[in-house]
Amino acid sequence: VSRPTLREAMKVLETRGVLKAVNGKGIFVTSTGDQSMISLLNFTKEKQNVLDVLEVRRILEKEIIRLVIHRATEEELDDLGETTSLLMKLFHEGKKQNHVDHKFHDTIYRLSHNDALYQLITSLETTMVSFWEYPLDLEDPFLKSIPLHEKLYFAIREKNVKKAQSINEKLLDEVEYEISQ
């Protein structure tokens, strides 16, 4: 087993409470029996689960983008523009932008003006956010996708459904590629 794979496994098991790192002493198993085995089995499925959720997200976001283009007001698009500007500013300054990235997508979901769709996509986002917060051995995850957010915003602003959907596909392709590695 390679060191990065082992580090990845250790991180996940630690965040799930199966392992505990004690400075100067080592790493210890905190739970035994079935629970730690279930956690271990869940870890092996982690990336595939995230990829499955990403696939559903891809399907839903295609329709969400169409709805946003037809339903969002100018004022709402201005708000999305402010979030986009902040995201790009943090990106260009080399600062973490995970929370602003999440806000960007959440804003798009809200601008669909479809409560059922919003609740569905945000329930999927809960799974994705846990991955963003504890990326599986990814140092600076999804940086290649950040510039595409600005392009997506401009395509939405132009009310160009096909272009916006295409850019969003590229954005999700980048995310999928990094997860798959």
Region roles according to the model:
Residues 56-134, 144-150, 155, 163-174:
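Conserved amphipathic alpha-helical segments that form helical-bundle/coiled-coil interaction surfaces
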Residues 1-59, 66:
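Short linear motifs at protein or domain termini
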Residues 173-181:
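Short arginine-rich
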